[in-house]
Amino acid sequence: MIRKRMSAYLTAGVACLAVPFGAHADNMDDLVAAAKAEGQLTVIALGHDWCGYGALVQSFKDKYGLTVNELSPTGGSGEELTTIKANIGNNGSQAPDVIDVGLVFGPIAQKEDLLQPYKVQTWEEIPATAKDPEGHWYGDYYGVLSFVVNKDVISKSPADWADLLDPAYRKSVSLPADPRTANNSILSVYAAGLATGAQPGAAAARAGLEFYRQLKDSGNLVSGFGSAASIAKGETPITTRWDSNGITYAENFRGNPPLDTIVPKSVTVAGVYAQAISKYAPHPHAAKLWMEYLYSDEGQLGYLKGLCHPIRFDAMRKSGIITDDMLTKLPATGDNLVFPELSHLVKAGEVIAKEWTSTVGAGSK
């Protein structure tokens, strides 16, 4: 198992490879003018309480005067790729210009020829381990997988993965979404497998599937997925979510109900998300401008305000743009945070998508 502190991961290999000029950052004045001529940007799966996207979208609109069409705000990464494919040749409002997907879905989309390359001006500050060298996709932020717990329902919060099997948590544990298509659920299963001591990759994926089978057989796994609403209602009182989700929900709920956001003691994973431009984007210049905005200091700080860890974190810390007082709301992770290798994630995602139904199925006992 590879364990790395955040800054060590983010400084690993920032050298970039040369690609044709057209894939590099455009002149900003020309890009802004071209984007304004298009007049619109279509995004997908950007919930307003996810990593500060509500404020980021509004700031982008205010800054550049573009209309932003928002599709399926609660959609998963797999749905984003499906939506691109379903709208090839459609230049209307249902065709996304850009996507924000779990890192494992970047290479999948590239392999399916759904993306066009583009390198933002801050390209060299994005770690080589979190980007395609040609610029088809690259990490934008990451979250730390945690347990989000409704304290009105659960008096003693779980501290680690094995605790979830406690009979006290009957009909209490949920995944955040469909693990066959959603990045946060794939990584929930994967992290549970790593916590058993399984080797990274397919072995950890299968160990995680077995763990969730045990949760189901014990009656602890509920059939529904853990949304903000279901957590608040007590329908999914223990849900695996990113740390940013739990903290944001707690702020929005204002103590009704009170929530705990707990980083598992033994092992947890960092979930890197990736931004990319659709090869079939109806508004390609607006898409490039959106990318430039997200990877600028302003955009990266927007992620941090939304309690997600920006991908340019290390460079921005070194330059003093990110200061200690900006990090006080983020839960401590210690040395138990794992940044999974992309090859392991790809294999794990394939195994979980293929074997979830046969191993775990759906619903509680």
What residues fall within each predicted segment?
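N-terminal signal peptide c-region/cleavage motif recognized by signal peptidases
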Residues: 20-22
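Bacterial N-terminal signal peptides that target proteins for export
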Residues: 1-11
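Mature extracytoplasmic/periplasmic domains
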Residues: 269, 273, 278-337
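Non-transmembrane alpha-helical segments in soluble domains
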Residues: 32, 106, 162-165, 193, ...
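Immediate post-signal peptide segment of exported/extracytoplasmic ligand-binding proteins
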Residues: 24-42, 61-63, 166-168
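Extracytoplasmic ligand-binding site segments that recognize negatively charged/polar headgroups
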Residues: 44-58, 71-85, 92-235, 249
